[in-house]
């Protein structure tokens, strides 16, 4: 069986990507199932036992910026080795709620960690590995903030300012501009039904 594909969902907190992730994966599984392929749904930080432990630390404990980035990439290496690469090798497709673009956007754009440091970690952990497709849920920070305020207690990142998320969004859009062959941008300021119509277009193009 041919190697599987790796799809990532990205966007600032409150963009709505997690809301649509399972719906997208269910539709994708309907298409792939007859060929004997499966859709593996995962997330970052997380995806493995170690990754989920790191997630609790990263989302809830203050720490040095470089420590934060190193922990992100440590969890990513484990995620690649134990979940993503084995699934792709057996022909399954993997859909992840966040991947390396999030680290460039949050730790780089949002927190100001120099890009060259993140690029060095990316090369070490991933080599040349990149997602086949990244779906970027784009929304103005003010709309995302209102959505975040309507749900559960926020974690460390969700509690950041609109200015932080404006920088994070700008970095996401910069990365999308640099890799247009990989990114599809979804206008997630739209109602849920309209966002799903956009995602149907993404599915149709796969």
Curated annotation (Swiss-Prot):
Keywords: ATP-binding, Kinase, Nucleotide biosynthesis, Nucleotide-binding, Transferase
GO cellular component terms given for this protein: cytosol
One biological process term in Gene Ontology: dTTP biosynthetic process
Function according to Swiss-Prot or TrEMBL: Phosphorylation of dTMP to form dTDP in both de novo and salvage pathways of dTTP synthesis.
Group of enzyme by EC: transferase
Sites where the protein binds ATP: 11-18
Transmembrane regions: none
Protein name as annotated: Thymidylate kinase
Pfam family membership, one: Thymidylate_kin
Family: Belongs to the thymidylate kinase family.
PANTHER family, alphabetized: THYMIDYLATE KINASE, UMP-CMP KINASE 2, MITOCHONDRIAL
Example of a GO MF term: ATP binding
EC assignment: 2.7.4.9
Gene name of the encoded protein: tmk
Catalytic activity: dTMP + ATP = dTDP + ADP
